[in-house]
Amino acid sequence: MRLKSNIWVAAYLRRCQTEGVYGAVVRRGAEEAGAVFVKVSLLDGQAMLYAPAPQTSYDDDRPVDRFFVPVAQQPLPEHTIEERLAKEIRFDPDAWIVETEDRAGRHFLDLAKT
């Protein structure tokens, strides 16, 4: 059983804070099981977006973990990411959007193995 989305987001933001990275909830989704998208602003007009990994990426040995995949391998213009997030919200109104700011692009997420 996975952590509720609101608890995971609170813990993730606390982790960012302890690493000296600013983070905030841009959009609250469903507290129980809303998908979480993480935008990492590089503070230069570019950003990275991390989306929930497909269910097939989950490890049976670690069922409580959340895994993410980068939407693109390279940073994208922030307006492109905002357009993508708007589409995600139209598709899934229960989704969460969390944004962090870090010039180095640190995200502190568990990435799915590809």
List each model region and its residues:
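Long, contiguous binding/interaction regions
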Residues: 1-20, 28, 53-57, 103-105, ...
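Short Pro/Gly-enriched beta-strand edge/turn motifs at strand-loop
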Residues: 18-23, 82
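Short, basic and Ser/Thr-rich N-terminal targeting/leader segments
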Residues: 19, 32-34, 91-94
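A generic local secondary-structure boundary/capping motif
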Residues: 13-14, 25-28, 85-89
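Short, well-structured hydrophobic secondary-structure segments
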Residues: 22-55
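Helix-rich interaction surfaces within compact, conserved domain-sized segments
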Residues: 53, 60-114
